[in-house]
């Protein structure tokens, strides 16, 4: 990990995992607990510290291994959202910060192993290789869609819509969200003014989507 005080250059070790393909990382917004996922086994782990190997396995998503994941907590810290990239869906896992325990994972948006592009409510929506999401201050989730070159928006109630880009059209175009073009967006984050920053992977750029 790196720190702001160190100019994001003071790289330090935190956790050493014995298996390859460790993917997906989330920090609880209130407690600071750190969670990560391993692709080969499919388990979500909690890092307890202080030693490198102080971690514990917690649960799998859909009892599956070989899953490529990205994770984020909602702003309240009451749920962990797990994007299963190579299964084209998003799971919601309730979390109790007082007892430090998770509930049962439940499918929140998209369909397991059902790739496509469909807007709509929750499990009726379809994604194509969604990646690292982020929340705004209103509880909306923004999901970069690597396979369709778009940014999707999911409301707190699970309504999925197109936020920016044109489905299936890779490119580089600035402008209004519906006219913008991306090329395999990988990650998003939301700034304090609700501006959305996009890691536009195959354009080798960081893009900014502003709220007018």
Identify the residue ranges that each predicted region occupies.
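Gly/Pro-rich loop segments of beta-rich domains
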Residues: 1-24, 51-69, 98-129, 159-186
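Residue-level detector of Asp-centered blade-edge/turn motifs that repeat once per structural unit
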Residues: 27-31, 73-77, 135-138, 190-193
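A short loop-to-beta-strand structural motif that recurs across blades of beta-propeller domains
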Residues: 1, 42-46, 88-91, 149-153, ...
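Conserved beta-propeller blade signature
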Residues: 33-36, 79-82, 140-142, 195-198
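Short loop/turn segments immediately following the C-termini of beta-strands
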Residues: 38-40, 85-86, 95, 146, ...
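Blade-level signature of beta-propeller repeat domains, shared across WD40, Kelch, NHL, RCC1
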Residues: 184-212
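Loop/turn-rich, solvent-exposed surfaces of beta-rich toroidal or solenoidal domains
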Residues: 131-153
């Amino acid at each position: 990990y790196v720190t702001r005080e160190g100019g994001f250059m003071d790289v330090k070790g935190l956790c050493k995992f014995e298996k390859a393909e460790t993917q997906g990382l989330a920090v609880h917004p209130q407690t600071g607990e750190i969670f990560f996922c391993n692709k080969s086994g499919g388990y979500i782990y909690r890092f307890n510290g202080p030693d490198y190997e102080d971690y514990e396995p917690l649960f799998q998503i859909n009892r599956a291994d070989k899953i490529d994941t990205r994770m984020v907590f909602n702003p309240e810290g009451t749920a962990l959202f797990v994007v299963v990239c190579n299964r084209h869906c998003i799971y919601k896992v309730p979390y109790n910060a007082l007892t430090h325990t998770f509930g049962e994972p439940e499918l929140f948006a998209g369909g397991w192993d059902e790739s496509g592009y469909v807007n709509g409510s929750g499990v009726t929506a379809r994604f194509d290789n969604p990646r690292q999401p982020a929340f705004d201050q209103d509880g909306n989730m923004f999901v970069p869609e690597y396979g369709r070159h778009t940014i999707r928006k999911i409301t707190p109630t699970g309504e999925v819509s197109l936020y920016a880009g044109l489905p299936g059209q890779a490119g580089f175009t600035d402008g209004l969200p519906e006219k913008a073009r991306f090329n395999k967006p990988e990650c998003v984050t939301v700034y304090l003014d609700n501006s959305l920053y996009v890691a536009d992977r195959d354009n080798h750029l960081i893009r900014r989507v502003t709220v007018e």
